[in-house]
Regions:
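Conserved anion/nucleotide-ligand pocket segment
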Residues: 204-218
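Core alpha/beta nucleotide-donor-binding catalytic domains of modification enzymes
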Residues: 2-206
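Hydrophobic/aromatic-lined pockets within catalytic cores
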Residues: 142, 211, 275-279
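AMP-forming adenylation/ATP pyrophosphatase catalytic core
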Residues: 2-36, 54-56, 91-96, 107, ...
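Residues that cap or delimit alpha-helices
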Residues: 172, 211, 263-264
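Glycine-rich active-site loop/lid subdomains used to bind and stabilize high-energy intermediates
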Residues: 182, 214-218, 229
Length: 300
């Protein structure tokens, strides 16, 4: 199946329909050198001219592979050849034996967010695409079948006053590759993307083995889940506005009578959000921990 490249007009419509920006925006773009981020850079390079803004390609060298430093130099030349400013962040660390992807991801976001604050960048784009979204959906589905997190990767996420924007979530990876090919842009290939020790790689290979019809079915399920979760989010927001009080030192108060009338699903998600915020954590507690707490509270 041949996938068409993404046109300038198509991309412009996507941005204007889903996102808003300040006048003459300064936007950071996470660039790994893969087809996804190179396609995003190409599309943004044209779009930003209309707003008279500027973009900065931000590359994070995880320093996990011997060839990563050489790849960074090759990438810098490619980006500068496109007329885009480039900056590199190198992660210096000791050997990591476990939870490599999780630790690397957390460190990457931490350092990139810090750089954006320093440069007064309030919008950061990443090149997550439809394939990534489906992979994440399947991975989360295996872990937690009813969580709001199952709706997968959000278009916009705000972290420390920085908007993390993902404008490519509606596009297949094949279309991003076609976009690079049309502009004769070669992308880098990370060999870790083929290492089946990582769950995401195994899920990716699983999806590759499925028919187009099956992929469409999974995507349809994902979209339905988004609609269901949006309705849940509205109910949670309504509860927070009416029944939640926050105090100093992470203390919160909710109306027990109103809380007890909610469904178990809403109770779990409400407590997840409260505890994540009160604890200053990036990730919410596990569902089984919340259930244990609810059962304990019920017995008292």
């Amino acid at each position: 199946m041949n996938f068409p490249s993404i046109t300038k007009k198509e991309f412009e419509r996507n941005l204007s329909s889903n996102f808003s920006f300040e006048n003459q925006p300064y936007i950071g773009i996470c660039v790994s050198g893969g087809s996804d981020s190179m396609a995003l850079l190409l599309l943004m390079k044209e779009w930003i001219k209309k707003l008279k803004g500027k973009i900065l390609a931000i590359h994070f060298d995880h320093n996990l592979r011997v060839e990563s430093n050489l790849e960074s130099k090759v990438l810098e030349k490619k980006v500068k050849k496109l007329g885009v400013d480039f900056t590199k962040i190198t992660w210096n660390h000791n050997k990591i034996d476990s939870r490599i992807l999780e630790i690397a991801r957390n460190e990457r976001y931490k350092k990139i967010i810090s750089l954006c604050k320093k440069l007064k960048i309030i919008n950061l784009m990443t090149a997550h695409n439809l394939d990534d979204n489906l992979e994440t959906f399947i991975m989360r589905k295996k872990r937690d079948s009813i969580s709001l997190g199952l709706s997968s990767i959000p278009k916009i996420r705000v972290v420390d006053d920085l908007r993390i924007i993902r404008p490519l979530l509606i596009y297949e990876k094949a279309r991003l590759e076609a976009t690079c090919k049309k502009s004769k842009i070669q992308w880098l290939i990370d060999r870790s993307n083929f290492d089946e020790r990582f769950e995401r790689v195994r899920v990716r290979n699983f999806l590759k083995s499925k028919s187009v019809k099956c992929i469409h079915s999974i995507n349809s399920e994902l979209n339905k889940r988004k609609d269901v979760n949006l309705a849940k989010e509205k109910k949670i927001l309504k509860f927070f506005c009416k029944e939640l009080r926050f105090y100093d030192y992470g203390v919160f108060e909710i109306c027990r009578e109103k809380f007890n009338k909610l469904s178990i699903t809403l109770k779990i998600e409400i407590l997840k959000k409260i505890l994540t915020t009160a604890g200053g954590k990036d990730f919410s507690p596990k569902r089984k921990s919340i259930l244990f707490f609810l059962n304990l509270e019920k017995s008292n």
